[in-house]
Amino acid sequence: MTKDMTTGSSLKIILLFSIPVLLGNLFQQFYNMVDTIIVGRYLGEDALAAVGSTGCIMFLVLGFATGIAQGFGVMISHAFGAKDFRLLKHYVALSLILTVIVSAILTIPTVAASRLFLVWMHTPDNILSMADAYIKVIFAGIILTMLYNVSAGILRGIGDSKTPLYFLIFSSILNVVLDLLFIVVVKAGTAGAAYATIIAQGISAILCFIHMFRQFEILRTTKADYYLDRPGVINMLSIGIPMALNYSITAIGTMILQSAVNVFGSSVVASFTAASKVNNIATQTMPTLGTAMATYCGQNLGAGKYDRIFDGMRKGFFICIAAAAIGAAICIFGGEFIVSWFVSNPSDEIFSYAMMYLKTVSWFFLPLAMIFLYRNALQGLGEGLVPMLSGVIELVCRFVAIALLQKPLGYHGICLADPAAWVGAGIPLMITYIIWKNKKIRQHSSSPA
């Protein structure tokens, strides 16, 4: 069902919206976990390192696609908050048209150049072919990944965070079955794990769209809604492109980090891969909060309810504190246990490198949480430039940290790169929101009663 986030308790609305999103994010991690666990246990440590070494490149490309899709969802929330249902239907149709165009533009060059990307990142020779086999399949399925994210973004834009979860649960179960089929039975190697993922995502997307058009009359498009108009395309892309570039800029920084890790060999790559999975699990409340705040701020901006935006952001700050504390506890006290999920018979060396990373980054989870709060809120408010520039600052900080710390501190210096990037990116986001808030307060106080 739809949810109007422009009325009622802001804290309750944000939390209730966030719960299904959190579960969805966890199942999204479950996709990746299943791939990693089955690859590590049935194909070995080298195959695990191969899949892990593709993570940054995948984030670069799929992150761009995801950012575009999330931008479409923001415009949906604006139209829904303003109760302009004619525009809402056109935005739904336009989202589908632009999804097909963007996915076609992304798929062809990435499939063709995947091996070259891996070579540029200094992927070890012993895992290069396995990594390329995996990532080629993932890139070939970009349209399926985009369609799921667009369908979820549309539904979340109208306040429905439950429906995407239901189809994702089904798809996650299917992903497990397909992983075992392609890897254990068919013996398709690392490519089998990729086939399982994109097929499961594609089925989830198709089912989600079928249900969406049947269940929600306000989203049910007609032939008349499907057209490319300059204002509509500009509105959609003016939000979507900065969000997409922000993902990609962040991914470039992560690629620099992964490239630095690759220099230390496949054992360290496997350790870093497993530790990154733990980190992703521990911090899932943070992107969840960000998704909720983008929709909440977008709907209330469309309705012109600025006081509710201010109140929701105050509540969001305290949620950040709780999310950071919970994430740090998971990494510090449960890190070794979760690492063992991803590596068969992990050595002391694997545990040592993985925990060094987790213990280092967990102390900086509050700045990370605040990035998600302020970046997504600003994007929901239509302020896409500074969030994108904060990604550039994040990239620069990560690069400088690696350049300065890798030689004197070795792997530990690499571990400090993420915290440096989070602190550097968070400060301008917070300042920009404060400036935006004060501007709206002045405009409100100077307007006639």
What is each model feature region?
Residues 1-18, 76-141, 185-241, 297-364, ...:
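Short alpha-helical transmembrane segments in multi-pass integral membrane proteins
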Residues 7, 11-30, 34, 57, ...:
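Residue-level signal for short hydrophobic patches within transmembrane helices
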Residues 16-35, 137, 148, 171, ...:
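Transmembrane helical elements of multi-pass membrane transporters/channels
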Residues 21, 25, 37, 74, ...:
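Transmembrane alpha-helix boundary and packing residues in multipass membrane permease domains
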Residues 26, 30-48, 118-125, 181-188, ...:
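Helix-terminus/linker motif at the lipid-water interface of multi-pass membrane proteins
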Residues 43-56, 131, 135, 194, ...:
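Small-residue hotspots at the loop-to-helix junctions and early N-terminal turns
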Residues 48-108, 145-164, 271-335, 368-390:
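Small-residue-rich hydrophobic transmembrane alpha-helices
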